[in-house]
Amino acid sequence: MRIQVNARNRGYDFDALPGERVLYAGLRAGIDLPYECATGTCGTCKAKLVSGRVRDRWPGAPGRKYVKPQAGEFLMCQGEAEEALTLEVSSFVYPLEPGACVPQSCSGTMRNVRALTHDVTAFALDLERPRDFDAGQFVLLAPEGIDGYRAYSMCNYARGGRSLDFVVKRKAGGAFSEWLFGANRDGARLDAFGPLGKATFEPGLGKNLLCIAGGSGLAGMMSILARAEAANYFERHQGWVFFGVRTMKDAFFLQELSHVSAEVTVALSEEDVPRGTQWSKLRFERGLVHEVAKRAMAGKYQNVRAYVAGPPPAVDAAIRVLLLDAKLTTDNIRYDKFS
């Protein structure tokens, strides 16, 4: 199906496969259409329908509160073309940068499914063919029988790798997490689309790294840290990691974090700091993760790039600290927040 998108700066033409969402078709064609979550929760990918017919794959998407259906607006991540379309988006749109990892559809097999805590599960997804991705990116996942994708960041880093590592936190009423926690999913098949996301790191950055993560938002940070460690990045630059959880029983990847060359602090929001732990290389503080980071980072923000991930309230609170207290410019704050 032919789709024409008219942006503020120019127009683009691309084809969508049968059943393919407009956003995914455009990204697959190498066009950097506007998006954030790519799953219907944020509203960033809204467009105005000029001509043609669109099927709404998720009429109840939270992101629909940001669109005006009566004005022809819809979410490209949930819109499926039923005939040739002409659309308008209000932002400037450019082709993906040369060398960027172009999102594609693929599928894979789950293996090594294991519990990290009472409500966090980890697994690897073995892909049918190798895929490139940048440290800090995410993909969209969907098992058979569940409509729609869910966004999850990779924990590992490997260009041309055939395995992606994930952590998933159980969410009451969440279709994917209930499916995952409901049975042994070793050997299950997942459809995937990606990689996506701009909260990425590469060793040529030349800045000190600050990572602030709440809960399973740590996943993308682990990918960034793996990339940095492989390049011996912390021999030349400083690094700080702040990992927020409610209690010690909610913490995971502590062994992996204890081997990171950056300074790592675990923030406990609902429990006092334990008197002694087996993790002698890690620091533990009481408080919300953005508050702990604010106290520890005072006066240390020179030449810093910050990465933030986690539940939307935690991400918003951390961004306020980085803008108002740290005085970081917006180009030095990279974040992902998934609802």
Where are these regions (language model features)?
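Fe-S ferredoxin-like electron-transfer domains
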Residues: 64, 71-123
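Ferredoxin-reductase
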Residues: 98-188, 207, 245-247, 268-272
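A short, basic/flexible loop-to-alpha-helix module at the beginning of a structural domain
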Residues: 194-206
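Reductase modules of NAD(P)H-dependent flavoproteins
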Residues: 1-79, 84-85, 239-339
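Short, conserved phosphate/pyrophosphate- and ester-handling motifs at nucleotide-, phospho-/glycolipid
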Residues: 136, 217, 311
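Phosphate-binding glycine-rich loops and their immediate beta-loop-alpha structural context
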Residues: 200, 209-227, 234
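Short, surface-exposed secondary-structure boundary micro-motifs
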Residues: 50-53, 90-92, 144, 195
